[in-house]
């Protein structure tokens, strides 16, 4: 048995997804710190979720993270906004880094796209690890900066990083 594996997300887990999204560990570093209401989640799920590709990252067949990738276009460019949702109230650094590697393996298979991540400035662990996964800071002078920040509604307390795939 593989120690780590992936499993595609489907509509059957709509309530589990909301439960994981509302865990304190996820809200702590999210732009939205409030718990998401079921009705808002259902509305988002059946409208916006179609633009998102998500899969569970499993450890010994138990979900530890959800990898998310929102795909969208800006002019002639294809973008991916990537994120991780913890399925556990607490995570360890090894599992987090392994999940990021699995997520990056998926992202690196996408071609001719720009991938963006945003990291809460208070998240000391991730603020020190983005460079090891091929990301660079998205500077304010970059042509994409204003569009990405506004389109994705990224708050002032977040840094944006990107890589060209």
Where are these regions (language model features)?
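A short helix-loop-beta-strand connector motif used in the catalytic cores of GNAT acetyltransferases and
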Residues: 43-56, 65
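Conserved N-terminal entry element of GNAT/NAT acetyltransferase domains
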Residues: 1-12, 153-165
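Conserved catalytic-core motifs of GNAT/GCN5-like acyltransferases
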Residues: 118, 134-152
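Conserved beta-strand in the GNAT
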Residues: 62-72, 81
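Conserved GNAT-fold acetyl-CoA-binding loop/helix
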Residues: 25-43
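Conserved acetyl-CoA binding element of GNAT-fold acetyltransferases
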Residues: 76-89, 118
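Conserved beta-strand-loop-alpha-helix junction that forms the acyl-donor binding cleft
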Residues: 116-127, 144
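Conserved acetyl-CoA-binding loop-helix of GNAT-fold acetyltransferases
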Residues: 87, 91-106, 128, 132
């Amino acid at each position: 048995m593989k120690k780590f594996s992936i499993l595609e997300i489907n509509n059957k887990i709509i309530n589990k997804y909301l439960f994981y999204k509302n865990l304190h560990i996820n809200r702590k570093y999210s732009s939205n710190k409030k718990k998401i209401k079921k009705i808002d989640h259902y509305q988002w799920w059946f409208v916006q979720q179609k633009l998102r590709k998500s899969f569970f990252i499993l450890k010994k067949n138990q979900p530890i993270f959800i990898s998310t990738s929102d795909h969208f276009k800006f002019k002639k460019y294809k973008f991916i906004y990537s994120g991780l949702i913890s399925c556990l109230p607490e995570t360890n650094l090894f599992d987090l880094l392994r999940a990021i590697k699995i997520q990056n393996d998926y992202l690196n298979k996408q071609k001719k796209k720009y991938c963006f991540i945003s990291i809460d400035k208070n998240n000391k662990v991730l603020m020190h690890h983005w460079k090891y996964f091929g990301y660079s800071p998205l500077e304010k002078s970059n042509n994409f900066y204003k569009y990405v920040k506004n389109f994705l509604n990224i708050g002032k307390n977040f840094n944006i990083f990107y890589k060209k795939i």
